[in-house]
Each structure stands twice: as structure tokens, then as C-alpha cells.
């Protein structure tokens, strides 16, 4: 009996217009069309990297509920129009661009001043309409991101966004505008119980539908590879061991390694201080109460410990460690 699962042998891409395509994949075992189609759709909508305006500064505007003399749109509508501009950045994660225009006419995305490594996919997109004597002067910050990030999330986490006049925008970074899928019947030789996956993908032009589905598949493979390799699994004993505080090896060495005078060493052993870890937990007052250990011996101990980066009165957790012999 054949136990190997079928893999799709046919992957066809049918363009349906600008940045819009239908991708057909077949054959799949029954049920795999919905399993993979739903997973790919969710990744396409949530996890694709894109670019969006995130902050705007407009000359003469303090907040988004203002109006601008000579501009037909109020600031709220102006910002909504600005969100429709599709930016694409090359070799950088963020950029600040300028838009300056005066005089009667239409302001479009093509009026934005761009560096050489930034492009606008829809330069004809209308941003505003200026009346006679109108003037628009804007600074627009564009960033790379993933998914949807509300402006209030970034506003409270970024000190720079608290500057008066700087308007923080809700940012929709996803370059994928619409995704739908359907599962149809497929046939291979005598088998008629197979699935055909048909995906309808529309992007904003930053990436093509074909590249979008490639990237989403890579993300799924990368996420599932953890389960395939069983990475990150460990026994309870290993987990407990990894969480246990690590003890500096020098603390496990006997006090004899400090090469103290015989008098000082004998005084310490008389107080059951056998290891350097035992010694550093004692305070000066505690050691001065030790019979036959005076101020001179105490100073000697402090100097020797200091040469090793240690002091008296230190706190150690889980001391003594298990298995340490006295």
C-alpha cells in the first residue's frame, strides 16, 4: 500500500491585472488544500514585510484635528490620503522624505522629494488639493514593518513621538491587500479524491503575488522546522540545571590557595571556613570575633581577596553547592 503523501506537481500563475494574480497548485491529498490554503492566507495577511508612513510633521499644524489655510482637505483627510501612498525602500529600514508645494493645483505622491534608493509605486495618488495661495510643507517618516501597528502603541513607547506637532500614524505595513482561496477537486490517473488549491492574491506592488506566496511559504517552513528538528526540548533535570545559578569556580577552591600566613589560615579553619566561598560570606566584624585573628590578619585577608576581585560580606545563593566536601 502506498503511504507517501502526494506533493503538488503543477503550480501555475495566471496574471489578472496589475499586482493581481491567481495561483493554482495541485494535486494535494484530500484535506490538505484547506490546511495549507488557510495557513498561507493567514501568513500572507499578517506576516509580509512592507513600508508605511509612520510619522508626519506639517508646517503650521499642531495636531491632526487642525485645518490648513489654502488646503481643501482637513488634516485628518490629508493623513488618510497619505496612508494610500505606497513606498518601497531599498537597502534601508526607514527614511524621512519631504513634500513641499504651493500654488493652486493637485498634490500627488509624485510631488514627494525622494532619495535615490526610495521609490513610490503609485505616483499619481492624490494627497491634497491646494487653492490659490495655498501651501503645503510636510516631513514624512517612512518605516519598514510587518502587519498593523496602531499609532498609540508607538506613541507611548517612543520619546521622539511626543514632540509637539509630530503626528504619529496608524501603520499598515502589509503589502498584501486581499487574499482568498478555494479548494476544488483534482484528479490524478484513477484517483478523484484529491484537492486543487486556487489562491487569489492582490498586492500593492511592493512585491508581486508570486513573491508574496514564496515568502509566506518560507515563513511557514521556518516556523515548522522547529517541530521537525524537535529543537528546544529538554528534560526536567536539564531545565532545572540550566536555571540554577552558576557558581564562580574560584569560590570552590580551598582557602589554602589564597597563600595566607599560617596563623590566618589556621584561624579560618578553626571557624570551619574551608573554601573561598565560605570566607567571602563572612563580614569583618564576624572575622574579628574569631580567636587569635586580629586586625593585621584581617587586612591581609582583605588584600588577598581584593587581588582576586572579591570582598568580604558578599551574598551567595545556594551555597554550599551539592557535593561540596568539608
UniProtKB/Swiss-Prot annotation:
Its EC number is 2.7.7.6. It is an enzyme of class 2 (transferase). GO terms for molecular function: DNA binding; DNA-directed RNA polymerase activity; protein dimerization activity. SMART domains: RPOLD. Keywords: DNA-directed RNA polymerase, Nucleotidyltransferase, Transcription, Transferase. It catalyses: RNA(n) + a ribonucleoside 5'-triphosphate = RNA(n+1) + diphosphate. Residues 247-326 are annotated as: Alpha C-terminal domain (alpha-CTD). It comes from the Bacteria. One of its GO terms (biological process) is DNA-templated transcription. Residues 1-231 are annotated as: Alpha N-terminal domain (alpha-NTD). GO terms for cellular component: cytoplasm; DNA-directed RNA polymerase complex. InterPro entries: DNA-dir_RNA_pol_insert (IPR011262), DNA-dir_RNA_pol_RpoA/D/Rpb3 (IPR011263), DNA-dir_RpoA (IPR011773), RBP11-like (IPR036603), RNAP_asu_C (IPR011260), RNApol_insert_sf (IPR036643). DNA-dependent RNA polymerase catalyzes the transcription of DNA into RNA using the four ribonucleoside triphosphates as substrates. Homodimer. The RNAP catalytic core consists of 2 alpha, 1 beta, 1 beta' and 1 omega subunit. When a sigma factor is associated with the core the holoenzyme is formed, which can initiate transcription. The N-terminal domain is essential for RNAP assembly and basal transcription, whereas the C-terminal domain is involved in interaction with transcriptional regulators and with upstream promoter elements. Belongs to the RNA polymerase alpha chain family. This is DNA-directed RNA polymerase subunit alpha. The lineage of its organism: Bacteria, Pseudomonadati, Pseudomonadota, Betaproteobacteria, Burkholderiales. The gene is rpoA.
Amino acid at each position: 500500500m502506498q503511504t507517501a503523501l502526494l506533493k503538488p506537481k503543477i503550480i501555475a500563475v495566471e496574471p489578472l491585472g496589475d499586482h493581481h494574480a491567481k495561483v493554482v497548485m495541485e494535486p494535494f491529498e484530500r484535506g490538505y488544500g484547506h490546511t495549507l490554503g488557510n495557513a498561507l492566507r493567514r501568513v500572507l495577511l499578517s506576516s509580509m514585510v512592507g513600508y508605511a508612513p509612520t510619522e508626519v510633521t506639517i508646517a503650521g499644524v499642531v495636531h491632526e484635528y487642525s485645518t490648513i489655510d489654502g488646503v481643501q482637505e482637513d488634516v485628518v483627510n490629508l493623513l488618510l490620503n497619505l496612508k494610500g501612498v505606497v513606498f518601497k525602500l531599498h537597502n534601508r529600514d526607514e527614511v524621512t522624505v519631504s513634500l513641499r508645494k504651493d500654488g493652486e493645483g493637485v498634490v500627488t505622491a509624485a510631488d514627494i522629494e525622494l532619495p535615490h534608493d526610495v521609490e513610490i509605486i503609485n505616483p499619481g495618488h492624490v494627497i491634497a488639493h491646494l487653492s490659490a495661495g495655498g501651501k503645503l510643507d510636510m516631513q514624512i517618516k517612512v518605516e519598514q514593518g510587518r502587519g498593523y501597528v496602531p499609532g498609540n502603541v508607538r506613541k507611548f513607547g517612543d520619546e521622539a513621538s511626543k514632540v509637539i506637532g509630530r503626528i504619529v500614524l496608524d501603520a499598515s505595513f502589509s503589502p498584501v491587500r486581499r487574499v482568498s482561496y478555494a479548494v476544488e477537486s483534482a484528479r490524478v490517473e484513477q484517483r478523484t479524491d484529491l484537492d486543487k488549491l486556487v489562491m487569489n492574491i492582490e498586492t500593492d506592488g511592493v512585491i508581486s503575488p508570486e513573491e508574496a506566496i514564496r515568502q509566506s511559504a518560507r515563513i511557514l517552513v521556518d516556523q515548522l522546522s522547529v517541530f521537525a528538528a524537535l529543537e528546544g526540548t529538554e528534560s526536567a533535570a536539564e531545565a532545572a540545571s540550566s536555571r540554577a545559578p552558576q557558581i564562580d569556580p574560584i569560590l570552590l577552591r580551598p582557602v589554602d590557595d589564597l597563600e595566607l600566613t599560617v596563623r590566618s589560615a589556621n584561624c579560618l579553619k578553626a571557624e570551619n571556613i574551608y573554601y573561598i566561598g565560605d570566607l567571602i560570606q563572612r563580614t569583618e566584624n564576624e572575622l574579628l570575633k574569631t580567636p587569635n585573628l586580629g586586625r593585621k590578619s584581617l587586612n591581609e585577608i582583605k588584600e588577598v581577596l581584593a587581588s582576586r576581585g572579591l570582598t568580604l560580606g558578599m551574598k551567595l545563593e545556594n551555597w554550599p553547592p551539592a557535593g561540596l566536601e568539608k
